């Protein structure tokens, strides 16, 4: 571009003609505008010459109020006729590219900044994407002309504009400050080469993040797996073990590869985008996305592994849709083999799904092929998505992580760590989960059914209901190298070949799973359904006066804003009244009027369903609820008493609910909550003692309701402890204790009218027992029988009586005693027989 009015007129005319057809948008504009110093000159760096790219960039700059690339710019005495340059020269008509020196504009810019110490300039790398897709050998017509890793000629670009111009995206990146580079005093030539290198690396990483790495065709990838040393060795061993020829074993490995591998197809991604845009805005009230800018910043140059929580089958589609719409490559998604069914399986596979069997046991050849396929994706930098929980959570809680995929990922990284791996937690919060009604049976204790994509079709008749909004929060990324540095500082120096299974792999993988789960919970999206569920399920009759409900919700909002759970947690906008109206509009909150006003309540079916939404945020309410529990049996407590009992119970809550704070930070967080309680009148601080309100006061009622959020969890803990203490040392195995706890919980739920089937969830008791073992409170003898530390009795009689009412403790002890007697009678009967 020059100062020539004629050239500017021609460019303006071409831009207007281009936009008769082209539609463009800017990706992640805030990420670079926040770092942009508008008082300093701006230059735009384009990867290669393209008048169409320049026209699109100029248009987006005008829309955003940014300096335009086609206008002149001054740096000291240097006046450039245009504020852009091309890093590489233009290809010829056959697409061939000639390598030359540095761009003249960049040469003059480096010289100007070097010669004038008071001057600075900003270089903004900017890319235009005409469609997004990884490069493939065969695909849809549009894919032929989408942006790829091939050098683009003029004819190809013209066709790209015609076919893909209505889906054009512009990515501005964070500015590079020339003063910082020149300030390193490396001289003109070295600074110039360093700037070029920075820009080349940047463009390569950005292209990988947006359109995907340069990967081969599926057939080539699958066949390539068979030539990898670990798979070749597995083929030899399979032939020997099964007494078959190596050719047959190789064919078997090839069939496994074809069963596993995705068939990522851009046309299917675009088709899903259209369908899902309708779905999220027609069935749901849209998607609210938070903190995605962190992913956009970390994706370039990293192998990104997305680890969402798993609440619904539509989770599979949600992330791919969101990433595509925000200019990031949709991931390869790990899906259960049960979803590889006719039509549906093909669609999912072409949308990026790769399929895995539920168990790899007894099939080392399959294990080798699957592991090698995943390793191939990782080292090529292709984003991957898998669910650390394994299956969908039917209770709304974060399930205990399944470590299989994490272990494969760790082993792959130990094998080749050149491509840094980063885990990106992803919290998905539904105001109404699509399969909610199908979960009811399992919430009532029915046997879990085998997962099937057809579960979606079972709820088609319910689509007339209002489903509310979907919230998607991206959590704090976890860089695997940094995690390993903390767990195993010398992991890089260890000799790990040939299987890459160090002794510490299992324990480290377990801790990685816990870290991922904690980061997922940190990113929780609290919605109106969650808060209404917490409030109403804490009442004895599942009902509250309309005004009382408003006060409770206002209190919860105030507390959660005063003591944020984490920077990645989001809260609903508005006040208690707006939350009530929102949930009433979803037909989950019933209303009854009388002479004194309105009563809001839950019917039996909705009460069970609402436990799901309460459990979504139980980890957020656990600590304040525990603190409130202390003041149900004690009218006053010192800070030291509160901290002592909190420290005693917190490890069990943290382990079950994946609460974020380590024990070293607990005291500080407790102080923050106590200060918030005092601020809201829930406690008074008098002479170094915290005092509860009068039992007849409104504040005490609010404190009591808050304490009940975690009450059933504490009751389950006490049940297991009471059964152990009544049974005596070395009497019960872990499995027997687990069974007794389940039966006891079922009995108590009937006696006390608890309408929460998860109260007797066997897996929760199993995890509590394991936590006692991990903490050294329990031990197993050679026969597998449990013995306990004296501190177990102190926990029962010290901390438990502070948080559980006397009548509840008495009832639990009586049922525990009766259960032990029945167990002994059954054992004696078996002995006589």
From Swiss-Prot:
Q: Write out the pathway annotation from the protein's UniProt entry.
A: Phospholipid metabolism; CDP-diacylglycerol biosynthesis; CDP-diacylglycerol from sn-glycerol 3-phosphate: step 1/3
Q: Which Pfam families match?
A: Acyltransferase, GPAT_C
Mainly localized where? membrane
For this protein, the Enzyme Commission number is 2.3.1.15
Cellular component (GO) terms are: plasma membrane
Note on domains (UniProt) = The HXXXXD motif is essential for acyltransferase activity and may constitute the binding site for the phosphate moiety of the glycerol-3-phosphate.
Query: What's this protein's name?
Result: Glycerol-3-phosphate acyltransferase
Q: From what organism does this protein derive?
A: Pseudomonas savastanoi pv. phaseolicola (strain 1448A / Race 6) (Pseudomonas syringae pv. phaseolicola (strain 1448A / Race 6))
